[in-house]
From Swiss-Prot:
Gene assigned in the entry: mraY
Catalysis performed (reactions): UDP-N-acetyl-alpha-D-muramoyl-L-alanyl-gamma-D-glutamyl-meso-2,6-diaminopimeloyl-D-alanyl-D-alanine + di-trans,octa-cis-undecaprenyl phosphate = di-trans,octa-cis-undecaprenyl diphospho-N-acetyl-alpha-D-muramoyl-L-alanyl-D-glutamyl-meso-2,6-diaminopimeloyl-D-alanyl-D-alanine + UMP
Transmembrane segments: 25-45, 73-93, 98-118, 139-159, 168-188, 200-220, 237-257, 264-284, 289-309, 339-359
Family statement drawn from the similarity comment of this UniProt entry: Belongs to the glycosyltransferase 4 family. MraY subfamily.
Organism (species): Xanthomonas oryzae pv. oryzae (strain PXO99A)
PROSITE patterns, sorted: MRAY_1 (PS01347), MRAY_2 (PS01348)
Protein name as catalogued: Phospho-N-acetylmuramoyl-pentapeptide-transferase
Alphabetical UniProt keywords: Cell cycle, Cell division, Cell inner membrane, Cell membrane, Cell shape, Cell wall biogenesis/degradation, Magnesium, Membrane, Metal-binding, Peptidoglycan synthesis, Transferase, Transmembrane, Transmembrane helix
PANTHER family, per the entry: PHOSPHO-N-ACETYLMURAMOYL-PENTAPEPTIDE-TRANSFERASE, PHOSPHO-N-ACETYLMURAMOYL-PENTAPEPTIDE-TRANSFERASE HOMOLOG
Record function comment: Catalyzes the initial step of the lipid cycle reactions in the biosynthesis of the cell wall peptidoglycan: transfers peptidoglycan precursor phospho-MurNAc-pentapeptide from UDP-MurNAc-pentapeptide onto the lipid carrier undecaprenyl phosphate, yielding undecaprenyl-pyrophosphoryl-MurNAc-pentapeptide, known as lipid I.
Essential cofactor(s): Mg(2+)
Keyword Transmembrane helix: yes
Entry membrane topology: Multi-pass membrane protein
Enzyme Commission number: 2.7.8.13
Length: 361
């Protein structure tokens, strides 16, 4: 929105040419989302607190979690609102990737909102029935995959790449591309949701991964950097740095209120939408496997649930004391802040490894 105004004003004053730089607008997007979150946060939390009872607590969970009863949830609505406003202000609204990612965020956020609403109003910790949740996620995930396939304007946009092996590039047919896009979008949506079980546990890795994806998006959309780093050139992908920056700013603003002990929980409205956005951006910039590395915390949390369920069904025994795995460490006696910070440290290391693949090729 403001970009169009700046382009017009540039004819009168060359200083407005700064707005043509993605990095400059990325910084503004992050700061805008951050300050909006800090400013609007208290009012949003007070509004959410009107839903008496807050987030339902699992009866079979760690005993320390019962003190969280009554904490407002659906705080992810603050993230979605500030990200959307920031992107609309600083993003190039003629870019199809911007609108696709915003649409994915809003659609998956709507699923999460309804899931949270059921948990709060009906006092049902399970929320929306799994089959309906996965059906809606599948519809939106497949729609995003189809959109990306049929609007691809360069072969690189529908080619599968393996990190660190620049000679491996697998062209994808329609079905294979859409299936991969579906699994990454829906998979990471649920992976972030599974991780969101402790105060601040999910949002910090999300911020870190978003920042790293912003680097990949910027490089992928730049002819010089893409050629130098031997990564796929995706015209228009650079604009996604605005969304990544907005997520980083909004995420840090939300963490101000979500840090231990949390004043508000993100809820499914935030976790499902942010995970889907990370998956979508990774698919656009053709860095699906790098996302698996950088989002390793989300992957580990998901695998712990899969292993736990499979083991119990096959052998009647549990591998972990409780899944997702962050609860396992809680039940081993780790204080919640220790679990959170150590998972953050792991996330930092994994993101740095992911960024290193830019040169190790």
């Amino acid at each position: 929105m403001l970009l169009e105004l700046a382009r017009w004003l540039q004819q009168l004053e060359s200083l407005f040419g700064l707005f043509n730089y993605l990095t400059f607008r990325g910084i503004l997007a992050a700061l805008t989302a951050l300050f909006l979150s800090l400013w609007m946060g208290p009012a949003v939390i007070r509004k959410l607190a009107q839903f008496k009872g807050g987030q339902p607590i699992r009866q079979d969970g760690p005993q320390t979690h019962f003190s969280k009863a009554g904490t407002p949830t659906m705080g992810g609505s603050l993230i979605l609102l500030t990200v959307t406003l920031s992107v609309l202000l600083w993003g190039d609204l003629r870019n199809r990737y911007v609108w696709l990612v915003l649409a994915v965020m809003i659609c998956f956020g709507a699923i999460g909102w309804y899931d949270d609403w059921i948990k709060i109003v009906r006092r049902d910790p399970n929320g929306l029935k799994s089959r309906w949740k996965y059906l809606l996620q599948s519809i939106f995930g497949l729609a995003a995959g189809l959109f990306l396939y049929y609007t691809a304007d360069v072969p690189a946009a529908i080619t599968f790449y393996i990190p660190m092996f620049k000679s491996i590039a697998l062209p994808l047919a329609g079905v294979s591309f859409v299936v991969i896009a579906y699994f990454w979008i829906v998979g990471f949506s649920n992976a972030v949701n599974l991780t969101d079980g402790l105060d601040g546990l999910a949002i910090m890795p999300t911020v870190l991964v978003a920042c790293a994806l912003g680097v990949f998006a910027y490089a992928s959309g730049n002819v010089v950097f893409a050629e130098y780093l031997k990564i796929p050139l995706i015209p228009g992908a650079g604009e996604l740095i605005i969304i990544c920056s907005a997520i980083a700013g909004a995420g840090l603003g939300f963490l101000w209120f979500n840090t231990y002990p949390a004043m508000v929980f993100m809820g499914d409205i935030g976790a499902l939408s942010l995970g889907a956005v990370l998956g979508t951006i990774a698919v656009i910039v053709r860095q699906e496997m790098v996302l698996v590395i950088m989002g390793g915390v989300f992957v580990i949390e998901t695998l712990s649930v899969i292993i736990q369920v499979a083991s119990f069904k096959l052998t009647g025994k549990r591998v972990f004391r409780m899944a997702p795995i962050h609860h396992h460490f809680e039940l081993k006696g780790w204080p919640e802040p220790r679990v959170i910070v150590r998972f953050w440290i792991i996330s930092v290391v994994l993101v740095l490894i992911g960024l290193a693949t830019l040169k190790v090729r």
